[in-house]
């Protein structure tokens, strides 16, 4: 299966990409019955954020199974410190051309934990990624981690697809900032509708994508 790479200007696969099913739909990566609020993608939250996320009560964060929403290889990862808490950032490349990411995920599955042994750190506020060599394939529905977050416990999936209209908003982040989608649209319909109905952060239900 091809891996998508960024050359500083554009994304391209290292082989012929497969077509995706229409409509393209993810498996919801977490138990929606435990989600207490939604963070909408494409809004300012201490700076512009192209990603959104799920929020959980802290009592659930230590027992939250996180599953891969679609099959694809883990291609980049980072370990970093936020305060005194170690955080893990994971990037997955879906063969048909999507990227998604998880941040603040912990209790990693054994095979992902083993793959991340090549990463040095963690370092405070340094989330620069390491490319996985070789990439690690993770099947749809496979467990990625078993807990999430720092208070107030968030996990952030970031789905990447061309959206040139907003490129100027992300002048310093050509790799991911020029691309984004409303990930609610790619969840099973009932879960996407629930995300839209849940309470939000102080920024509310504003989004350049949704």
Regions found by a protein language model. Name each.
Residues 1-89, 93-96, 137-143, 179-180, ...:
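Surface-exposed, glycine-biased beta-strand/turn segments
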Residues 55-57, 103, 159:
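Residues in well-ordered beta-strands of folded domains
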Residues 8-10, 15, 32, 155, ...:
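Short linear motifs in intrinsically disordered/low-complexity regions
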Residues 87-93, 135-181:
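Short hydrophobic beta/alpha edge segments that flank linear recognition/processing sites
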Residues 69-131:
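Zn2+-dependent peptidoglycan hydrolase active-site motif and core
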Residues 129-134, 184:
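Low-complexity, serine/threonine/proline-enriched polar segments
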